[in-house]
Amino acid sequence: MQLAQLAAFAMTLATSEAAYQGFNYGNKFSDESSKFQADFEAEFKAAKNLVGTSGFTSARLYTMIQAYSTSDVIEAIPAAIAQDTSLLLGLWASGGGMDNEITALKTAISQYGEELGKLVVGISVGSEDLYRNSVEGAEADAGVGVNPDELVEYIKEVRSVIAGTALADVSIGHVDTWDSWTNSSNSAVVEAVDWLGFDGYPFFQSSMANSIDNAKTLFEESVAKTKAVAGDKEVWITETGWPVSGDSQGDAVASIANAKTFWDEVGCPLFGNVNTWWYILQDASPTTPNPSFGIVGSTLSTTPLFDLSCKNSTTSSSSAVVSAAASSAAGSKAVGSSQASSGAAAWATSASGSAKPTFTVGRPGVNGTVFGNGTYPLRPSGSASARPSAGAISSGSGSSSSGSGSSGSTGTSATSGQSSSSGSSAAAGSSSPAAFSGASTLSGSLFGAVVAVFMTLAAL
């Protein structure tokens, strides 16, 4: 009995720092109808039981607010509690609705307390607000964004709200496109967060050679650039994927076969090693968007459109993607900003024509509020209310059409070496999963604890 208890304890330690893997979940279906608790539960249950996987047990939310309400708590929260699904909470920061998001956050903490606290892995203040605030975002009619100074104030406000509550120890970050992170005009946000949420879609990098054959390379480069500005802060993969159907973008072709290739070459190395929320479990219910990224079809099912088993993921693909996403070992801050930026020169001239989709099913509406239509179409309405004013647009584009993924200025100390530093990246030089940001591998202290337990077992 004692042996069994010690072994169980050792396994608990070994899995306590496992990376989170899950999907993004909006508060509406593709026809703009609301999702309710039963709908979220069905999605979470399907994700946990996907054929060929160990289960996707985490959910990233874009908003705290139930669709079409003013500040009611999103019903994904009781659904997550019922299904034991961990949560990356999101507060929609654009469009003037932050007060309502804060109200919903406070209500959720008060209503669910420790039940919520034990499931929340992080809080994202905003989603792609800096992208929408950029020149590129304005050109794409992506909707209303937030300038970096305002976003920093929102981050401070959320820290104040959760202090002394069941969420007091939860880390706070922001999610944005990789080329928004590398834009030096947004460096204040990098400084304000605990971690950086990375959104990157090689499929949309249409100004470059973005066929599926080059997708892994584009992904690695964009993650490396993000790590260069992150320094010793973790980078979480908060959105990526490849569409199963829809129109082509440059050399990129949407197909089930290509979606599987991207899953094998990019997703499989990340899963279990880096905190990752894939886009998306299902986006074709009841109507199919163009393009469509869902790995299950129009009927929610545990049977995916392609094999998710990762048996075709190669060692070379794994080590390369791992290295691109590498930071410090869990619980360690060993890789400083100067080390992380040293390899960025290799990709200083890389860029995206469009580093992200300008749509997404189930997000808040085009006008930047939760009262929008729930969908970002490929070309949103060009109405004045759907675009940031000229004065609100960042001085530097997160991604210029001519090349560099960062603005021309030197930016923060973490990025100042991008164009002049030499040598290989500190991240890229390691193929060890222990170097992952958000790694499932053990930190030194945790590893020591596990070793101690097994030494005790051996002595009995």
From Swiss-Prot:
Which residues get glycosylated?
A: N183, N312, N367, N373
Q: What keywords were assigned to this record?
A: Carbohydrate metabolism, Cell membrane, Cell wall, Cell wall biogenesis/degradation, Glycoprotein, GPI-anchor, Hydrolase, Lipoprotein, Membrane, Polysaccharide degradation, Secreted, Signal
The EC number(s) given in the record are 3.2.1.39
Report whether Lipoprotein shows up as a keyword of the record: yes
Q: State the signal peptide span.
A: 1-18
Where are the active-site residues found? Answer: E128, E239
Protein name, as recorded: Probable glucan endo-1,3-beta-glucosidase eglC
What organism is recorded for this protein? Aspergillus niger (strain ATCC MYA-4892 / CBS 513.88 / FGSC A1513)
